Amino acid sequence: MVHDTDPSPHPISRRALLRHSAALAGSLALPAIVPASVFGARAPSNRIQVACIGTGNQGIGILRRFLGNEDVQIVAVCDVNTGSHGYKTDDQYLGREPARQEVDAHYAQLARSGSYAGCTPYIDFRDVLDRDDVDAVTIVVPDHWHAIMTVRAAERGKDIYCEKPLSLCVRDGQAMVAAVRRHQRILQTGSMQRSNPLNQFVSQTVLAGRIGTVQQVTAYIAPNNFFGPG
């Protein structure tokens, strides 16, 4: 993330306010971890509002991670597929409507009224990015869409989690980095396997030639997925 060096005043966002509040708490020597019960339930207005673009096999997994985070409120889902079976297994039913239903059902369990209908489904990702109340987006779609959506999201002032690979070519990757820096956004990608010590050991072993010449590599990419790797 690039820090703002412009001395002129800027309107403060909910995210910026939360960050400044956290810094202030630290300066007052509060405990590093404060139980949520001290402050009571987190108000919806204090949560980071997230929209999930892409709700297939990988996308629904990311969505569920965010559902388990009390600092986040999922307010929208987006997918061109309304809903269908057969993503990774024949009985798996995923897509835009299943994702919306899961989000609403989750928040309904937490609501005093026992009902919730605050997650809006979209077909076009541009409609999601046009929402001023969306703070961040997840982009879990076919690879050739990553650069387009990331650049557009940065331009619209959203922070971004984008699945790997970030781009299909160096030029697209450079455009993504430039857009994120220009608009001072946060971009994270899901390349955690590269940090896994076991994976690093295997890679180093192969590169060092300790297993001899590699004759064949087999890749597993959701063979039962009728709508692509996502």
Cite the ranges covered by each PLM segment.
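N-terminal glycine-/serine-/threonine-rich beta1-alpha1-beta2 phosphate-ribose binding loop
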Residues: 2-156, 171-186
